[in-house]
UniProtKB/Swiss-Prot annotation:
Residues that bind (2E)-4-hydroxy-3-methylbut-2-enyl diphosphate: 41, 75, 125, 168, 253-255, 302
Residue sites binding [4Fe-4S] cluster per the record: 13, 97, 225
Name of the featured protein: 4-hydroxy-3-methylbut-2-enyl diphosphate reductase
Molecular functions (GO terms): 4 iron, 4 sulfur cluster binding; 4-hydroxy-3-methylbut-2-enyl diphosphate reductase activity; metal ion binding
Entry's Gene Ontology BP terms: dimethylallyl diphosphate biosynthetic process; isopentenyl diphosphate biosynthetic process, methylerythritol 4-phosphate pathway; terpenoid biosynthetic process
InterPro entries for this protein: LytB/IspH
Known pathway: Isoprenoid biosynthesis; dimethylallyl diphosphate biosynthesis; dimethylallyl diphosphate from (2E)-4-hydroxy-3-methylbutenyl diphosphate: step 1/1; Isoprenoid biosynthesis; isopentenyl diphosphate biosynthesis via DXP pathway; isopentenyl diphosphate from 1-deoxy-D-xylulose 5-phosphate: step 6/6
Species this chain originates from: Chlorobium chlorochromatii (strain CaD3)
Length: 328
């Protein structure tokens, strides 16, 4: 049985890796550092950093801090967080992902131009909370691309200027499905023909451009991170190429759930674990009279490579025969 470890489409994305690198450097310098929320949605990595001196605080804990150093993670934060930090004399180490920072600016500018903001994403996701803060927490947040949840449309004004954006880790097909459904919904409510929403670029929404160019009433900007979304097809193909797939991610990881579902759709014998204690020996038993010849190990953008290696080594040592190798 061969163990295939995916090193090209698994492991930290650039944004998360940057946060981890800065956290490690700060911990070496200071000995202790507070993180506002889990530094990454991976419990195993959080515990590793906590052993180095990282202290995770929630909303209540953050508000009680003063005269100390706090890490802002890659997901980003709303403006209110920085206001509290200034009031409490907190030294902020800001590791907001550059992709998220640009999206926050886009959201803020669109709101200033009078657009009601629709975010394709998950209401409780920290990135979405940060985005919503850029527009005074007035955004409509829609998770269901088919508009199956009427509550998500409460407060929507179909005749008003509207801009659709997305949480960076959502799926591309879902975003465009939502756009099409919103176009049809607006036309139906307004009693008009379907009006395609116009794609915009960052340059289109700067203050200077808006003075010389009329902005359309309905616009959208595909803000899904391509470094993340490009992994979809690669992990799909990786899953097809192996008899069994062990997908490693934190249970809180939004990206992990998306990628796991992609792997599972490609290969029904895909199993989700957070750590090696959850591995079931039956996964590697013969299936329909055929022995398992290959096991693929992959994970989310929030899964550290060292942990994927740990899982691969464990499966090799415990379940593979003596002739197996870890293929890279």
């Amino acid at each position: 049985m061969k163990i295939h470890l995916d090193r090209t489409s698994s492991g930290f994305c650039i944004g998360v890796q940057g946060t981890i690198n800065v956290a490690e450097d700060k911990l070496q310098e200071l000995g202790q550092l507070y993180s506002y929320g889990d530094v990454v949605h991976n419990e195993v990595e959080v515990k590793r950093l906590e052993a180095l001196g990282l202290v995770t605080v929630d909303d209540a804990g953050f508000k009680q801090l003063s005269n100390t150093s706090v890490l802002i993670r890659a997901h980003g934060e709303p403006p209110a967080t920085y206001t509290i930090a200034a009031e409490n004399n907190l030294a902020i180490t800001d590791t907001t992902c550059p992709v998220v920072s640009r999206l926050q600016r886009t959201t803020r500018l669109l709101f200033q131009l009078g657009y009601q903001i629709i975010i394709y994403g998950k209401r409780v996701h920290p990135e979405v909370i940060g985005l919503n803060g850029q527009c005074d927490n007035c955004a409509l947040i829609i998770k269901h691309a088919d508009l199956s949840d009427p509550k998500e449309l409460e407060g929507f004004e179909p005749s008003a200027k509207t801009a659709l954006i997305s949480q960076t880790t959502m799926d591309i097909p879902g975003f465009y499905e939502l756009k099409a459904n919103l176009e049809a919904y607006v036309a139906r409510v307004n009693g008009s023909a379907v009006e395609p929403w116009m794609a915009i670029r960052d340059i289109d929404i700067t203050a200077d451009m808006s003075k010389v160019r009329t902005m359309p009433r309905y616009v959208f900007k595909d803000t899904i991170c391509r470094q993340v979304s490009s992994r979809n097809q690669k992990l799909h193909d990786f899953s097809l190429a192996n008899d069994v797939v062990v997908f490693v991610a934190g249970k809180k990881s939004s990206n992990g759930q998306v990628l796991f579902n992609i792997c599972k759709a490609a290969n029904p014998r895909t199993f989700f674990i957070e750590d090696i204690e959850e591995i079931n020996p039956e996964w590697f038993a013969a299936h329909e009279g055929k022995a398992v010849e290959s096991v693929g190990i992959c994970g989310a953008t929030s899964t550290p490579m060292w942990h994927l290696e740990k899982v691969a080594n464990y499966i090799e040592a415990t379940y593979a025969n003596s002739e197996s190798i870890i293929a890279q």
